[in-house]
Amino acid sequence: MTDFTPDAVLDATGLNCPEPVMMLHQHVRNLAAGGLLKVIATDPSTRRDIPKFCNFLGHELLQQQEDAGTFLYWIRKKAD
């Protein structure tokens, strides 16, 4: 478990590829530079897609974890 306090939460529970990453892209756009976003997902492909999204766009994936089929991600938006 983590002590991160997110500025926003994206609940993509029940959504399948490509919806979680599409929603993530919109949520990151609305987040202030340096803001922290928590993503909750159930699609196993997010284990691959979200780290690639962060790497490609320069955002920091602070932590990811899995708990009983639920995937959690904490993403810090890059500075502008």
Curated annotation (Swiss-Prot):
GO terms for biological process: tRNA wobble position uridine thiolation. SUPFAM superfamilies: SirA-like. Signal peptide: none annotated. PROSITE patterns: UPF0033. Gene3D superfamilies: TusA-like domain. Keywords: Cytoplasm. The active site is at residue 17. One of its GO terms (molecular function) is sulfur carrier activity. It is found in: Cytoplasm. Sulfur carrier protein which probably makes part of a sulfur-relay system. NCBIfam families: PRK00299.1 (NF001423). This is Sulfur carrier protein TusA. It comes from Pseudomonas putida (strain GB-1).
